[in-house]
From Swiss-Prot:
Designated name of the protein: Spermidine/putrescine import ATP-binding protein PotA
CDD domains the UniProt entry points to: ABC_PotA_N (cd03300)
Membrane topology reported for the UniProt record: Peripheral membrane protein
Binding site for ATP: G43, P44, S45, G46, C47, G48, K49, T50
ABC transporter domain sequence ranges: 11-241
Cell compartments where the protein resides: Cell inner membrane
Reaction catalyzed: ATP + H2O + polyamine-[polyamine-binding protein]Side 1 = ADP + phosphate + polyamineSide 2 + [polyamine-binding protein]Side 1
E.C. number: 7.6.2.11
Entry keywords, A to Z: ATP-binding, Cell inner membrane, Cell membrane, Membrane, Nucleotide-binding, Translocase, Transport
Length: 373
């Protein structure tokens, strides 16, 4: 049965502050996490994402603010008394213990009666599909299996929150993709809150109910994977989440409440935005590679599109990825088209002259952060 994200918060971080000597990592940091949610904290190295996780876990002491967990202030509560468990990148399994004993370790530390331990351990192993491995040692398991055991050990205590710190980054690409699906399915089955920290954008988009993007300790955007990808709130988020083309534009006039006429890289066209704009104002028009369209042109053919030439083309199975160099300023544009072998125009030749366009409303329009006009 799929869990339903509940609106009741399981965690509230209120005006949280953490510094190391003179170096402030987060300051006045506020975040509410709902019960049953799969939340990913995403950001580049040094943005503060692991610090936030460690503060929730109790591995770091806050310099200010509050951590509320299921209605209780746990700011000063030691890690071992908080109803959270953490899965680390290194897995941290005990090599001299069997898989069963690794998973049972936390229960024994909590002095759970022996008659309860075996069924709970076997249930946890069953959840990660490794019940038959109970008598093996960690060294006899693959990386993916060790990852699952680390998760089983974390969930056997029935924590209210599971914290995962870059937990899949040590796996190879194929296994990581498999574990992403398994982890999300397990979270649904358990119905507990998962907080996942990663710098991998694709991983965040694949697994999360909600993503927060961090930069220098600040939340740049908080939203669903689709919102983060399709409606980035600023240029940092747009550039950090996947490939994106950023076109320079200048406002000519507002057409109506939804459309603005602008010069976009030499092409006069209407763009959709509700930003308050004035004539001459600089904007950025953002388009994902899959949202850009190409039309092959003869060398002297007239077109209202942005003109460029194919400089690189790569067949990727389902898609053809092309790099277009714009004629007027040599800017490179990435284009991803679904490959159709029956379409004679899909496989472009190098140096082919092309027109670059897009479907109206697919663009994202942001203010030019360097425009001081």
């Amino acid at each position: 049965m799929e869990n339903i994200v509940q609106s009741k918060p399981i965690i509230e971080l209120r005006s949280l502050k953490k510094s190391y000597n003179e170096n402030t990592i987060i300051d006045n940091f506020n975040l509410t996490i709902n019960n049953g949610e799969f939340l990913t904290i995403l950001g580049p190295s040094g943005c503060g994402k692991t610090t936030v996780l460690r503060l929730i876990a109790g591995f770091e002491e806050a310099n200010g603010g509050q951590i509320i967990l299921d209605g209780e202030d746990v700011t000063d509560l030691p890690a071992e008394h908080r109803p959270v468990n953490t899965v680390f990148q290194s897995y941290a399994l005990f090599p001299h213990m069997t898989i069963f004993e690794n998973v049972a370790f936390g229960l024994r530390m909590q002095k759970v009666p022996n008659e309860e331990i075996k069924p709970r351990v076997l249930e946890a192993l069953r959840m990660v599909q490794l019940e038959e491995m109970a008598d093996r040692k960690p060294t006899q398991l693959s990386g993916g299996q060790q990852q699952r055991i680390a998760i089983a050990r974390a969930v056997v205590n029935k924590p209210k929150v599971l914290l995962l710190d870059e937990s899949l980054s040590a796996l190879d690409y194929k296994l990581r993709k498999q574990m992403q699906n398994e982890l999300k399915a397990l979270q649904r089955k358990l119905g507990i809150t998962f907080i996942f920290v990663t710098h991998d954008q694709e991983e965040a988009l694949t697994m999360s109910d909600r993503i927060i993007v961090l930069r220098k300790g600040n939340i740049e955007q908080d939203g669903s994977p689709r919102e983060i990808y399709e409606e980035p709130s600023n240029l940092f988020v747009a550039k950090f989440i996947g490939e994106i083309n950023i076109f320079d534009a200048q406002v000519l006039n507002r057409v109506d409440e939804k459309r603005v006429r602008a010069n976009v890289e030499g092409r006069v066209c209407d763009i959709y935005t509700d930003l308050a704009v004035k004539e001459g104002q600089k904007l950025k028009v953002l388009l994902r590679p899959e949202d850009v369209q190409l039309e092959e042109l003869d060398e002297n053919e007239q077109s209202s599109a942005i003109i460029g030439h194919i400089r690189e083309r790569n067949y990727k199975g389902m898609t053809l990825e092309s790099t277009v160099e714009l004629e007027h300023n040599n800017k490179l544009v990435l284009v991803s088209e679904f490959f159709n072998e029956d379409d004679p125009n899909i496989d472009h030749s190098l140096d082919q002259r092309v027109g670059v366009t897009w479907i109206e409303k697919w663009e994202v329009v942001l203010n030019d952060e360097n425009d001081n006009a």
